[in-house]
UniProtKB/Swiss-Prot annotation:
Keywords annotated in UniProt: Hydrogen ion transport, Ion transport, Membrane, Transport, Vacuole
Descriptive protein name: V-type proton ATPase subunit E
Molecular-function GO terms, alphabetical: proton-transporting ATPase activity, rotational mechanism
GO CC list: fungal-type vacuole membrane; membrane raft; vacuolar proton-transporting V-type ATPase, V1 domain
Subcellular location: Vacuole membrane
Protein species of origin: Candida albicans (Yeast)
Chief location of this protein within or outside the cell: membrane
Matching InterPro entries: ATPase_E_C, ATPase_V1_Esu
Coiled coil start-end: none
Subunit description: V-ATPase is a heteromultimeric enzyme composed of a peripheral catalytic V1 complex (components A to H) attached to an integral membrane V0 proton pore complex (components: a, c, c', c'', d, e, f and VOA1).
Family label: Belongs to the V-ATPase E subunit family.
Function: Subunit of the V1 complex of vacuolar(H+)-ATPase (V-ATPase), a multisubunit enzyme composed of a peripheral complex (V1) that hydrolyzes ATP and a membrane integral complex (V0) that translocates protons. V-ATPase is responsible for acidifying and maintaining the pH of intracellular compartments.
Amino acid sequence: MALSDEQVKSELSKMQAFIEKEAKEKAKEIKLKADEEYEIEKASIVRSETAAIDSTYEQKLKKASLAQQITKSTIGNKTRLRILSTKDEVLHEIFDEAEAELKKITKDKKQYKPVLVGLIEEGVLALMEPKVSIKVREQDVDVAKEAITEAAKNFEEKAKFKVEISIDDKNFLAKDIAGGIVVVNGSGKIEVDNTLEERLKILSEEALPAIRLELFGPSTTRKFFD
């Protein structure tokens, strides 16, 4: 049975409505899927960018922290070096003053002679030989001769044998040193340096820890004490 024109139009309208409905639903489905994919991609990009920002911030923070530590360490080191330098200057001043005082003593015969006696006696006892010579400053020859007599007597009492002590008048000690003597054995191969500079040097090395402690107190970095 053939369809009338009205029936054909009705069927076409139905088909058109169905197609339009299907198209709208498909379009809606595509849009929803696209929106979903967009949100997923957007979230991924946001996470990626956030991670990148966090990483960059963390790196900058680490660099800033490292720079701060380096600066702090540098300042600390410079401060410690400055303190050490100041302490050394103070110690040098102390020993320079001590040397200056020694030079004053050598200008006073009454004070200097007992010092020479002790230095000569100590040097001769160290060598324990029957014949020695001593080197002195040229300006100390007279007082040294007097000191030799007393030092030889003291040596004999302690060593139980005599010693002959002579002054080396060909090899004087430098005029600008503080004073003291150098004792030389009979063969001329062994010397005992008992100049005031040498004695002050030895004293400074031995007394330095105690002087540091007295002046500056216990070291904050030292873990062990004698």
